[in-house]
Amino acid sequence: MACSAEAVFAELHALSNFSFLRGASHPKELVAEAARLGYAALALTDECSLAGVVRAHAEAKTLGFKLIIGSEFRLEDGPKLVLLAMDRRGYGQLAAFITLGRRAAEKGEYRLLRGQLETHPLDQCIAIWLPEDAPDDETGAWLARLFPARCWIGVELFLSGGDGLRLSVLQALGERLGLPLVACNDVHMHARERQPLQDTLTAIRLGRPLAELGYALFPNGERHLRPIEFLARIYPRALLEESLRIAERCRFSLDELRYEYPAELVPDGYTAIAWLRELTRQGMAERWPEGAPDKVRRQVEHELELIGAMAYEPFFLTVHDVVRFARSRGILCQGRGSAANSAVCYCLGITEVDPARLDLLFERFISRERNEPPDIDVDFEHERREEVIQYIYRKYGRHRAALAASLITYRVRSAVRDVARALGFSPSRIDTLARVLDRHGVAETLPERLAEAGLASENPAVRRLLALMQMLVGFPRHLSQHVGGFVIAAEDLSHWVPVENAAMPERTVIQWDKDDLESLGLLKVDVLSLGMLTAIRKALAYVGEGRGRPFTLADVPPEDPAVYEMLQRADSIGVFQVESRAQMSMLPRLRPQSYYDLVIQIAIVRPGPIQGDMVHPYLTRRAGLEPVSYPSPAVEKVLKRTLGVPIFQEQVMQLAMVAAGFTPGEADRLRRAMAAWHRKGGLEPFEKKLMDGMRERGYEERFARQIYRQIRGFGEYGFPESHSASFALLAYVSAWLKCHHPAAFACALLNSQPMGFYGPSQLIQDARRHGVEVRPIDVNHSDWDCTLEPTEIPNPLSLWERVGVRALQTGSNPALRLGLRLVNGFSSAAAQRLSDARRQGPFQSIQDLATRVPLDRRELEALAAADALHGLGGHRHRAFWEAAGVEAPTPLYAEPQFAEAEPLLRKPGEAEDVIADYAAAGASLRRHPLSLLRERLDRRGFRTAEALWQVRNGAIARVAGLVVCRQRPMTANGTTFVTIEDETGQINLIVWPATAQAQRRALLRAHLLAVSGTVQQEEGVLHLVAGRLEDIGKWLDGLVVKSRDFQ
């Protein structure tokens, strides 16, 4: 875009908050303010970064304003300068130069030298030299040679008292060197009001309190976008007009980026679309050996035609190649999300949702009208995803492949902590502040939280803290790596977007996140991780070894009634997607009986259907308590599978098309507006089109209003049917394993931690409730992983030799041996050394163990603390004493030379052992901690989880239990859901906001919680609405139980 004819100034040096902890304004704010002030253009020049340019570009396009792309640099052995891209080639040179500096340094840093500026091609970039107070001619002459007719001296004046002298010095310098001068302003914020925040960011960056910074702070607030009239009073007009000449030469826009996908996956003799068609044909033959249904063939042909027209075939070939590699290595993977709407993806083996089984909507995935790249999310086993990532790096090279960034922003807790430190609050006060703010702390409740920390909100220092914190929340803190979004290019990626090192070794990331990529319409491959895939693969292997033959996903029988009966009882701990408190509450009400019921089960326990008032109508119709009717056959076709209630995003899109006349592209825009309206609004234009379209087609006003109300309820929380269908497949397989092979399933879950909703303690308790014999950690039996052992030991040798899963033919109900991975402070490497030594024979004593296995004292004491030495040293106290006293052999003395008399050590009591088990291993096979307190609890009128079912609805009851998890869904209006556990089962608590507010400390901190509340029992679901909460952790002093909170 050309510069405005009326404007007389373009700002060429502006930093946003993507110059982390320097800039004090969002890119959008800078662009909007520059446009408001009448600037001709704005150059966003974050330090060695293009991380904020996409956001600035989007705002500039909206406002019809010119944005210049550039970056500020401080050469390690040279000057400070700004580089501006003149055209597409210059942009590529700039991005590559940023990459050069970032790849040479640790994450978050960069390193550039004068020599690199000389050798790196930058012939399509403009340089603005920003001299220090005493500029030297040599540097200027050097830059003038490097950038002939493209180098300026930047003059920056801030009313600091020496402006006149500085201007004259730089004018003389320019005359000597023949370099023109241009006005710049080193902008750090869009408005003066951000100066206090900019000072605070400086303190955070330097790690020192504001009061100690002195000259490290800017002397005044002049580094903001200032009115042109004001600039005309402090700069010679020629310097302002020079900025326009530079701006005119910078004609690049991010709209010029044209992304090209790798082409090497196409063999000779084929075009990309021909090869994709051939792979699809091969996959179709494998999926349907007897021939694909006509419906599927038509759908595949439609998809291939559209994929070819949109030139997306290289993207599909790349994802197919990644999936093919994973499967060749035995890594479980499965596509999900909107890609599961694609029959081509199913044929290619990317997704597992059979298009012949479900009526899916391809337009949810790819739309000609939308003309945006498709999004294919593929989940891989979380323990083996790195193999897939490194394969991508090897195949395409680090110069062509990198992960997308993830932008880490300030939240309330982190903002308060950093601001408080900058303001000089004491460490203890800062820790108190952080404790009283939970993860979902919101600014509106901060005064109350501060009062709880002993800080009055009317205190001036506290008011300052609050004001700065509220400005800082939402600011970018740093770039991290996306969970798995890969960007792969046909050529060098660094000419397209800067690439930098990630914190994790062997990883590189680009400087844009997924929203930036989507905004520019650029493709990424999502290589995601899923713990349940790891657990399923391990469980299938255990089952297969027990049966003496491989057992795969294809061997899991479909639609097993026993599986659905188990789920109807809400017996779903560990089962994928249906193990949460909310899902367990829904299972007895929905009573799934088929795969598609599971699809609905997963989707209906979501904020969208709940807020759209779709849950109750569906359940009453499913139970036969309410008739199902449809206003037309077209609507019936869309809603029949969900009994007339729209539950999925695809149904909303289909309704808009069949009932209101939307095109597929318009329906997809409606979906996107739904996803954003809570944050941005934007549904209103669709309301009129929906209402008018339905009226024109003869639908009643009441029906039209009901549909629109449900669409609003969906908001950003509507669940795609394709996504739910993908997850339902894994939910069924995990439920089948739990139902028929509980030992293998529990073993796999424990060996895949951390994952899922429950920790090891709850998984072990659940396995025992399902009849699994769980055996303790023991150095003579345990490996690193938990293992399966036969329940009938065939010979004495097996007492010490791990028989593992290969020996399970001797018993159909294997026992679960806990592994050394549960021992706090014990490493997998130490476990491997122990297992290797044990192959020579069982350990006879703790001294024998210490002699044969190179373990340090800390590792031995960790084993003793976890009671893993009970077979060698007797009870825990004695084993710990022996572990602390062992002597490692030396070259001179092969055996200990002195025997110390054994003291009389008291055997620990049962409660002491239980507490020690939890502390050292996070679980116990002894009596449940609550059973130790049961007599005391009974005297005080506490009921067990089992007895609570006998209490009538609406009655008051008292219960107590270990806290398993705490949840506060975003759409629950502040309600907290807590699950506690006693020796008979689990109890689900509902804590209303007022109760949570009044009793926050007990709610958020207690490991052992006593609750008095009202019983709520309906349709086979039981809750206790909490009235009073009490932390009774002192009843078992020292017991620490790790709960899974606010996941």
UniProtKB/Swiss-Prot annotation:
Its main location: cytoplasm. It holds the Pfam family PHP. Its EC number is 2.7.7.7. It catalyses: DNA(n) + a 2'-deoxyribonucleoside 5'-triphosphate = DNA(n+1) + diphosphate. GO terms for molecular function: 3'-5' exonuclease activity; DNA-directed DNA polymerase activity; nucleic acid binding. Coiled coil: none annotated. One of its GO terms (biological process) is DNA repair. Keywords: Cytoplasm, DNA damage, DNA repair, DNA replication, DNA-directed DNA polymerase, Nucleotidyltransferase, Transferase. It is found in: Cytoplasm. InterPro entries: DNA_pol3_alpha_NTPase_dom, DNA_pol3_alpha_thumb_dom, DNA_pol3_finger, DnaE2, DnaE2/DnaE/PolC, DNAPol_HHH, NA-bd_OB_tRNA, PHP_dom. One of its GO terms (cellular component) is cytoplasm. DNA polymerase involved in damage-induced mutagenesis and translesion synthesis (TLS). It is not the major replicative DNA polymerase. Belongs to the DNA polymerase type-C family. DnaE2 subfamily. HAMAP family: DNApol_error_prone. This is Error-prone DNA polymerase. The gene is dnaE2.
